[in-house]
Amino acid sequence: QINSWKDLLSPELAGRVALPNITGTQGPLTLFMLSKALGHQGYGFEETIDNIGAKADDIVTFYVRSSQLAQLMNQEEVIAAPLGRFAWSRFSNSPLPFVWANPKEGQTGGMNVMIMTKGNGNEDLAYQFMDYWLSEESQTRIANAKIDSPANKKVKVSDEVAEGLTYGAE
């Protein structure tokens, strides 16, 4: 059972944990949460990186893709790892009894953004695309396909779909 982010570096889980590569979406988020759990101050992360480095032999791999992690977990080579909620469906449909942990330090979250280059000459088209992407119709399709959590608060999905997304009043 994972009660804290620092449990990922515990002797009990040594040799059974995967951490995300720092270059992926979950890498910096995991580094931040481990730093918080270990009681490190500031945003330099040197101490946290040193802690992870000291445990490198206890970490099965630093995964790059959630598909890689799913394979390792389904083969039972890894039993614990941080991952984004968007990838949870790969695990929730497994015959193995995976559960979502809720560490006392909290969960991580990322936010997708859309940007437009100033003076690009296609501002109207860019705004039309943004409106389309954020529309209830598009966001519902994206959520139901389990591609991403909806950004439009009018989107309604089934409980089954919601289980794999960041979704709801909170």
Task: Set out the residue ranges of the language-model regions.
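Short, hydrophobic alpha-helical packing/hinge segments within bilobed ligand-binding/sensory domains
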Residues: 69-72, 88, 126, 139
